């Protein structure tokens, strides 16, 4: 049933107002109403779904458009979305009320977790809409807030969940970047926001990117030069200017009552009305253009997201494997040098003790951290941390598991998914010093090979063991390089956090801006830079660590 069906004498926006909730306290000159929304029972991690109205009786024949709205914290994204809803519902300058879809005032008072979800609003078409279609708005949390890079990475994971789920979003019409008009050059944070989002999309989405400029006036927005300079892939006009739409929502909730005293107030009202009219024209232009854009499937984007996540998991494990390989090589060299150094003593006494440095596996408690993990019970290694899957019965869905074979891509034994568990600890490695004797070493290898072992044979066995590990590392590196090359083929932009120079730029930006929590964010970025440097060498076919060069040469 259409609860908004209005009588001929009643405008559609008035009918919606009658069903809406007045927001209190009233913060501005006009009362503001939250439109009636129904929360949908769709379970996708990190996402919430709301609908306005009911689906058309025409079903799938009813035209529908989907937009995603993105922006850095403070770019004016929430106000812009509220401007859209007032336009769609037909609110006029002279009306004595306004609507809100996104209530920034309320969300700021709530815990971070309440404002951290990707929110999907489905506005079902009704007679009285100013647009001829149903509209889905994907509202993302603001990028670049005080919670830092880790929080921003969570947002991309939430979008990934939304695009990959059968109940989520499978196609898109416009990816809308909200940017402030006055930014002559993009800050490192702004550029990071653009590149982070672009990196999750397939190349076929480039034509659907639109720039929404906020706090605009009648002039050419300076931010367009910054967008051109930063290389954001988006459609451009004949003169090379990015396709954009200008908005100034300063008049959205402004006083529209006629001034009956000072002429100065009269001028101010005319000024506000001018901005309102400008906003209405911009909205009309934007939604007319939206109705002409070719809808794109998110199939390629899902492929980008899947391959990038698999690469991240592999890189984490690759670093561990290479370091373990290097530690094993050092252990072999140290053992050989000690045997040579004490050769005379060993000949007369096989129980002669010497110290050797090595890495030992240890369990690190993660209980209480809120993180899940995937550990291989057979190999006693951590295959994926943090993992988004808490239930062991669902571990086949972990990023470390090959979905075709059901076997782990990361652990040494390539074990079946059902021997992988969510546990209260992760496996790590610590440097220890152990006492060794040649007799013990020989006995261990004799037990393994069934052959009598000489000191020379012992050294060959140690070297052979290292060669096996080195070969495994090489295979991992080749797999990662293959994945990197595939991402270059299909992704719209590389992941900004995969480039050491880019991360260094972010670090310098954090230091200069010195916003609250900057030291913690810099610390996080330094760790990412180390990973990025590691991966850059892998991609070039170089030895990932400088120590590896020297150890390989000297052995």
Spell out what each predicted region is.
Residues 1-555:
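Conserved GTPase G-domain substructure that encodes guanine base recognition and part of the catalytic core
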